[in-house]
Amino acid sequence: DAAGKPMDGVFIDRNGDGLVNEKDKYRFHKPAADVFYGFNTSLTYKNWDFAAAFRGSWGNYMYNNVDSNNGSLAGVLINPTYLSNAVENVLETGFTTNDIKRFESDYYIQDASFLRLDNVSIGYTFNQKPDSKSLVKLTLAAQNVFVVTKYAGLDPEIASGIDNNLYPRPITFTLGLNVNF
C-alpha cells in the first residue's frame, strides 16, 4: 500500500504485462552466504589463559516461516489459545488469511547475516613450578555464547534457508579439571 505495508494476497506486476501471474515470480535473495568467515584468539598471562573463537556469514537470507505461520489474524484467531503465539507484526501486516499465497510473498525473507561467539574459555593453572611435569588446571568454557544478527527468527544459521520451528541451539557451559603428575 502507500505506507509500504504488505497487502494480503496482492502482488506486483513485475514484468509490466498487465497480469499478475507465474511470469511475475522472481527469486528474492538466496539462503547461501556470499562470505563465510571466522577468527580466534588466545592469550596467556602468568597462570591464566583465555581463548575465543568466532564465526559468521554475510549475505545470506532466511525465510522466517515461524513469523509466517503466526503472522496472520486467521492463524491466531481460530483458537483463543493461539493468540499468545502471535508474532509482533500480526497487526502491522494486516494479513487476514492463512492461505498458501503468503509463501509466495517476500515479506518474510530477512537478512540472516550473523556473527556467533562459538567458544570461549578461561583457565587457571595452579602452582606450576618450572621444570615440573605435574600441574592442576581449572577451566571454564562456554559454547554458543551469543549471536549478533538482524534476523528476527530463531536461528540465522539454517542451511535450507527456511526457519521452521527448530529447537534453538543451547548455551553450554563446561567446567574442567586437569590433573597431571
Language model: regions and residue ranges:
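C-terminal region/CTD detector
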Residues: 37, 51-53, 60-62, 130, ...
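Strand-connecting loop/turn motifs
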Residues: 45-48, 133-135, 170-172
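C-terminal beta-signal and terminal closure region of outer-membrane beta-barrel proteins
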Residues: 81, 91, 100-102, 147-181
